[in-house]
């Protein structure tokens, strides 16, 4: 698949930084001087940009020859500098601090101007949506973004996008001066259920429409604008909060924070996948009990931070804006999390950060206690990865040197069975492909491989031994 097509598809498949965006205290300092990092960053950006132009099917004849020359020159310039720096400083693929700077501009964006909230017309297959882009926006600088999902009005209909924007944030809010705000247009027939009832014939089609209206449109924004992947937020109104929690469970590495303006019970959902996400629950007299109950559940999920914010005005609580912004300032996604839990709520959604389940039992048919779940913990000090899996036959691990030392063999412990993994070679081209596929310049993993979960040994009475 061409790089240009992969960039486009990544925004729909997953909806789609700076040097410190995903570093952890264990990561060594950069090897390169800032000027050398910046030089490689610019050359990689040109390399990717010219490859996309070369892959363009519309480039034929002299246009293709011109694109070929530009691509060859950019590729040679990047690899020449990469080799020079690698010869001097060692393998750059092991230096996370350097990679994050070098890849920060690897996904190209058109130069677009700021705009107050404006409706973007539907363009098949992307539905219509509203978009606000701050005056401070620059295509070369990652910008915080909010997916603002409207709530229901008194007639149980979804509030129109501009009306909802004005009721919650508006152009005058400080947030609008430094944040991209995306408001989907939700059709009257769409129900943002906590969990669809797939026994109904229309459920699959309704789920497809939800994804188109909310997620496909947000992917369009991420393709067109330089959205900071470490600072994406989901802000949901009444009637959409259950769906917001489900969406966060499906895509745990998509949002750094989730704001629920009318929290509700989500008893149908397993919440184990939410580690790493910050939650802000807006509490009123009507929702105080629901806030307390949801917080009690979220507090039991390792890696989740949940805050209740008492409100002082009427729903949807525009007066809470300054406190919400203060909370948002402290939220930032960390990609290289050392512990990952995946507890799927649907069979299709089974990936988080650097772990994805390949083969598993069906969530919908497995008995309680045997539903698929995997817990993966990387210990770089011991150069060990521990995996505890239930209902899972195999999984894929994407690794970098923040998680384990790839210069040496490392130990895998899967359901208490340990073995030594041989040294894995870092691969630049596959790292680049995975980053583009994910549409995320912080997703930097030069190694990927499959782990098969050992089948449990049968007990003596099950094998007939001793009879």
Regions found by a protein language model. Give the residues of each.
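Bacterial N-terminal signal peptides
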Residues: 2-17
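A domain-start/cap signature at the N-terminus of enzymes
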Residues: 23-144, 426-440, 444, 455-462
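C-terminal catalytic histidine-bearing segment of alpha/beta-hydrolase fold enzymes
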Residues: 27-34, 38-41, 288, 292-384, ...
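Active-site machinery of serine-nucleophile hydrolases
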Residues: 143-145, 149-223
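Short alpha-helix in the alpha/beta-hydrolase fold that links the catalytic acid
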Residues: 160-163, 288-298, 397-401
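Primarily recognizes the serine-hydrolase "nucleophile elbow" in alpha/beta-hydrolase
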Residues: 223-224, 230-276
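Short beta-strand/loop motif that positions the catalytic acidic residue
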Residues: 280-283
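C-terminal beta-sandwich/jelly-roll accessory domains of carbohydrate-active enzymes
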Residues: 344-466
């Amino acid at each position: 698949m061409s790089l240009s097509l992969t960039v486009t598809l990544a925004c729909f498949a997953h909806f789609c930084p700076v040097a410190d965006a995903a570093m952890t205290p264990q990561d060594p300092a950069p090897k390169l001087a800032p000027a050398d990092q910046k030089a490689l960053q610019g050359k990689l950006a040109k390399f990717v940009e010219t490859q996309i132009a070369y892959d363009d099917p519309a480039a034929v004849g002299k246009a293709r020859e011109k694109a070929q020359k530009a691509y060859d020159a950019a590729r040679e310039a990047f690899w020449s500098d990469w080799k020079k720096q690698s010869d001097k400083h060692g393998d750059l693929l092991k230096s996370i601090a350097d990679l994050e700077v070098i890849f920060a501009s690897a996904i190209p964006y058109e130069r677009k101007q700021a705009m107050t909230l404006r409706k973007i017309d539907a363009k098949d297959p992307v539905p219509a949506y509203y978009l606000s882009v701050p005056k401070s926006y620059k295509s070369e600088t990652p910008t915080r973004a909010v997916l603002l999902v409207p709530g229901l009005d008194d007639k149980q209909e979804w509030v129109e996008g501009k009306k909802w924007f004005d009721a919650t944030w508006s152009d005058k809010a400080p947030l609008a001066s430094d944040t991209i705000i995306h408001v989907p247009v939700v059709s009257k027939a769409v129900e943002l259920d906590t969990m669809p009832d797939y026994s109904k014939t229309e459920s699959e089609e309704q789920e497809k429409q939800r994804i188109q209206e909310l997620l496909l449109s947000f992917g369009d924004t991420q393709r067109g604008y330089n959205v900071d992947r470490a600072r994406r937020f989901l802000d949901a109104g009444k009637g959409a909060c259950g769906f917001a929690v489900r969406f966060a469970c499906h895509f745990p590495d998509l949002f750094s924070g989730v704001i629920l303006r009318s929290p509700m019970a989500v008893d149908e959902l397993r919440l184990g996948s939410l580690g790493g996400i910050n939650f802000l629950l807006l509490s009123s007299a009507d929702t105080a009990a629901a806030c307390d109950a949801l917080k009690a559940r979220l507090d039991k999920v390792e890696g989740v931070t949940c805050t209740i914010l008492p409100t002082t005005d009427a729903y949807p609580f525009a007066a809470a804006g300054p406190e919400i912004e203060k909370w948002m300032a402290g939220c930032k996604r960390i990609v290289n999390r050392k512990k990952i839990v995946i507890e799927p709520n649907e069979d299709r959604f089974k990936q988080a950060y650097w772990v994805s389940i390949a083969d598993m039992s069906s969530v919908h048919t497995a008995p309680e206690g045997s539903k698929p779940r995997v817990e993966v913990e990387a210990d770089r000090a011991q150069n060990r990865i521990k995996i505890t899996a239930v209902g899972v036959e195999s999984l894929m691990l994407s690794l970098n040197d923040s998680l384990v030392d790839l210069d040496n063999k490392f130990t895998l412990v899967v359901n208490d069975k340990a073995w030594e993994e041989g040294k894995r070679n870092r691969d630049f081209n596959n790292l680049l492909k995975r980053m583009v596929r994910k549409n995320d310049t912080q997703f930097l993993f030069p190694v990927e491989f499959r782990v098969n979960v050992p089948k449990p040994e049968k007990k003596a009475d099950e094998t007939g031994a001793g009879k």
